[in-house]
A protein has these predicted regions:
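Active-site acidic/histidine proton-transfer and metal-coordination neighborhood
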Residues: 1-99, 109
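Histidine-acidic metal/acid-base catalytic patches
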Residues: 20-21, 83-194
Length: 194
């Protein structure tokens, strides 16, 4: 546990040293053989210790959802999957340096919507990971099943003017690592011009 805290404290210090004002954290890699309550308590305790360090460094921690049991082939953690779970954690900790990162693929897999996220978090959303995908993971733009243009319109309708990142969708594109970004940027440029 202490090694984990030191690791994340180093990440916070590195982010601050690089001039980054945000650091995205998630619960991937959680132990599936432990009770959810224990995992929740451990995550809350870790964040409780990290939030003051992040605030002192001028870094905002963004809690990102992870794939859960609803996606068994790529499940990352049994907790902190849905918008409701992230909302409960934010309310439990109630710290100004803690926000969220919206990942459109995980959002969709959990049955949430952009409107759900903005209804819960609005000013707590510090980053949007705009990524296509399905229940088997992330895909290059247009190769998943998600309504990406609808997500863009929803973000615009909600007045989101913050940063958007494009997640590199894993090992399937190792032979062409630039391909997913090229697809996403082409789609985004087309959307902006429309």
């Amino acid at each position: 546990r202490e090694a984990t805290l030191r690791y994340y404290e180093s990440c916070i210090a590195l982010a601050a040293g690089l001039g980054c004002d945000r650091l995205v954290l998630d619960a991937s890699g959680a132990c599936w053989d432990r009770k959810d309550e224990l995992l929740w308590r451990s995550a809350a305790d870790t964040l409780y210790h990290l939030c003051p360090a992040a605030q002192a460094a001028g870094v905002r921690l963004l809690l990102a959802p992870v794939m859960g049991a609803e996606t068994p082939l790529i499940a990352e953690s049994p907790i902190l999957n849905t918008a409701a779970e992230l909302d409960a954690m934010l309310h439990q900790l109630n710290h100004p340096s803690l926000g969220v990162c919206l990942d459109t693929n995980i959002m969709s897999a959990c049955g949430d919507t952009v409107y759900d996220w903005f209804g819960r978090f609005r000013d707590k959303i510090g980053l949007v990971r705009l990524c296509d995908g399905n229940y088997h993971g992330w895909r290059a733009w247009g190769e998943g099943v998600l309504p990406m243009q609808r997500y863009l319109h929803a973000l615009d309708a909600m007045g989101y003017r913050g940063d958007i990142s494009l997640r590199l969708p894993g090992e399937r594109y190792l032979a062409q690592p630039a391909y997913p970004d090229e697809r996403a940027l082409a789609a985004l440029c087309g959307e902006v011009g429309a």
